[in-house]
Amino acid sequence: MIAALFTTNLQLGAVGVFIFALLAFAFNKLTTWEYSIPKEVQWVDRRTQPFSYLRAKARALARSKENTLEAYFRFNKLGKAAALAVPFGRPLLLLPQTFVRWIVDQPESIISLDPIHDDFHVFVGGDLTGDHTVQELLRRELTLNLDKLISVINDEIVCALDDVLGNSPEWKSTSLADDLKTIVARTSNRVFVGKDLCRNKHYISTVKGLALVIMPETVLQDLIPQFLKGPLSRITKAFNNIYGMKKFSSLLLGVVRQRYIDVKDVLEGSGDKTRLPDDLLTWMVQKSIRKGESSANIDKLLVARIAMANLAAIETTTAAMTRSVLDLVTQGSEGGFLKAVQEETLAVVEGCNYEPSKKDVLKLVLTENAIKEALRLQVAFPGLMRQVVAPNGVTLENGLHVPCGTRLGVSAAGIHVDESIYEDPTTYNPGRFLVRDLDPRGDPSPMWKGNENYLAFSLGRRSCPGRWYVTDQLKLTLAHIFSKYEIRFEKAAETASALRKILPGAPQDRVMIRRRSVGKR
């Protein structure tokens, strides 16, 4: 009897294990998108083990840059494609650098950036799937108005630096990245929503925390079947509303509603156009009304769009600014780059009485080269990411067929440290851009203008839509920092995983900083 029961339980256990394995295989098949990668393509850091793709994806949290570089030097340099598991989103097919122009020139009906954006937009709130309003306004209206906004941007930089870094001639220890994030959030939101909100401490604290609520959820995009993404997005939106968007909305909603009324009055001829702020929110409302978008939920949609603008701007600009400052402070003395930037920035800002125009910003050539070099070395992820949208896929010139749904790109990190492209590629040398990539007049090419060898802002019509603004924002901020403050590197951040770095309380590089006696206003 006991033997029979034992045998029965053993059989049931075996059946259970089989069913579990079958379900696990089915779940893995439904969720990972690993099967969109052509079978003949080799993977980077994918080992022979159960759930090998998911485990490679987990390891990529700490190995993203290493894997991207390995794909480039082990495969792409030999003319071969390589497959990569990435922490956020579907696996990526990395193509050799020779495909850069091919990617840029393909029509949107073949490969597109939009599905990648949409996977992220679904978590923000509102109905932003397929909505490109933010990108369009940053690319057109912000760029066209940039010259006259320089004084506004400069005013906020000056005020934010005084508030955050202070005016004391005494040395103080501070977390550079967090301080710069506050400054970036304030200057960006001065252009997004105006002076009052950008100086509201509760609002700035909230926008700084948006990414901590929303970014981790993007990991789920590659871990659930397509048919579950709709229900999941509704759940995560509810979560976001409680922990992030609710507070953000409460601070912004009144401003949005009043701005909608003011813009509508102007368009109908009963309002004063001169009293409308030239900022992103005004342009959003104008575009919404002209498109005939329903006014029923327009306030929530506009709030979601402002949230998206903040998510796109704050994290990336903060990272670029932090790296630019730290590289100059820690490596810029050798070669005289730090001294050159200090002298240039002081001459420019004092020469215009600390109220620069666009012409003054253009004079910050050495400062721009320092930022450009920092971005060259900072890039850790693939570039030119696109998703194949042609229903039958696309066949590359080398005969490789890439199915619909596959995401592809190039290893920007690898290109940027290729010794056949850059001399001493891993050495910090802003001076390299004084002699390479020059324009027809022999002047250094502007940072926002990429090429096949420099992809910090991507390339082509789908480049970073705010790259002109970001270039000026970075240059102006560094001009004020290095003309007004002394900075010494104090302590490097403790080693941490990529996931740990995006969580609250993550270790940060620390610096000592004090106000200079010269350059005070």
Swiss-Prot record:
Highest taxon of source: Eukaryota
Task: Report the Pfam families cross-referenced here.
Answer: p450
Molecular function terms, GO-annotated: heme binding; iron ion binding; monooxygenase activity; oxidoreductase activity, acting on paired donors, with incorporation or reduction of molecular oxygen
In this chain, heme is annotated as bound at 464
Please list the cofactors this protein needs.
Answer: heme
SUPFAM superfamilies, sorted: Cytochrome P450
What is the deletion mutant like?
Leads to the production of pneumocandin analogs with non-hydroxylated ornithine.
Alphabetical keyword list: Heme, Iron, Metal-binding, Monooxygenase, Oxidoreductase, Signal
**PROSITE patterns per record:** CYTOCHROME_P450
Signal peptide residues are 1-26
Q: Note the InterPro entries from the entry.
A: Cyt_P450 (IPR001128), Cyt_P450_CS (IPR017972), Cyt_P450_E_grp-IV (IPR002403), Cyt_P450_sf (IPR036396)
The EC number(s) given in the record are 1.-.-.-
General function of this protein: Cytochrome P450 monooxygenase; part of the gene cluster that mediates the biosynthesis of pneumocandins, lipohexapeptides of the echinocandin family that prevent fungal cell wall formation by non-competitive inhibition of beta-1,3-glucan synthase. The 10,12-dimethylmyristoyl side chain is synthesized by the reducing polyketide synthase gloL/GLPKS4. The thioesterase gloN/GLHYD exclusively interacts with gloL/GLPKS4 to maintain turnover of the polyketide side chain.
What is this protein's record name? Cytochrome P450 monooxygenase gloO
- Organism of origin is Glarea lozoyensis (strain ATCC 20868 / MF5171)
Q: What is the lineage of its organism?
A: Eukaryota, Fungi, Dikarya, Ascomycota, Pezizomycotina
